[in-house]
Amino acid sequence: MSNSPVSPIQAVIFDWAGTIVDFGSFAPTSIFVEAFKTEYDFDLTLEEAREPMGLGKWDHIQAVGRIPSVNARWVERFGQPMDTQDIDKIYQTFMPLQKAKVADHAAPIPHALEVVQGLKDKNIKIGSCSGYPRQVMDILVTAASDYGYQPDCVVATDDLPQGGRPAPFMALKNVIDLGVSNVRACIKVDDAAPGIDEGHNAGMWTVGLLLSGNEAGLTLQEYLDADEATMQAGRDKARAKLEKSNPHYLIDTIADFPEVVADIERRLLEGERP
């Protein structure tokens, strides 16, 4: 019989890249750049590749093509905007590249494993979902497991016919599979706006990550070496993007999450809802 305290929080649903693993969310970003270059000899900047992060990968490619700077160069080069056939070709190039390299970016973000274990010790279930498709997720899940990260549920962006973010379906699939009885007892944690929107749309508490993810775009070494001015610049850049989604909380990295959990527990016990 466990003596662990019972938390009013039933589950936390984490994103993957930039949230729990892959500091800076570099695995998908660098592969988008490579896929555009390989298929069409088209140069994409890392900044452009990052812009719509959090969407499913086909939708992400489509969204990149609609960025004004990308669209202008594409039309100048090919005479017309990117169409569905172009997106399909880039996606088909993206998939094997991503599958080949995603395991290289499976290392947990500092303190992620301890934070997750702390949640499990309180009998809080660990859900997860991602903009990665299932065939990429299966590789990443295995690689992350080798590091010690084993969530109770994994939902990929193409698992559900209804689609992925910013709609709530992946988060709600976690709710069903984990046996959660009330969505307001769930927290959605993400480093990108579509994932925060997903949490809101599912009726959950939402937490955005400023420094470990896509928006700040720092490598782990850059983060570890950063002075306060660099850190603040990263925070400001990420906050400008994430605040538009009105997350309930914004923190630097997963290391700061236990304080948020304690505050949400207090608010739930006082009768608040997201």
Residue ranges and their predicted role:
Residues 2-10, 113-118, 133-135, 139-274:
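Asp-based, Mg2+/Mn2+-dependent phosphohydrolase catalytic module
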Residues 19, 130-132:
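Conserved phosphate-coupling serine/threonine residues in phosphotransfer and NTP-handling enzymes
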Residues 5-113, 117-122, 138:
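N-terminal helical cap/lid subdomain that shapes the substrate entry/recognition surface
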Residues 105, 129, 163:
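Glycine- and other small-residue-rich loops at beta-strand/loop junctions that grip anionic moieties
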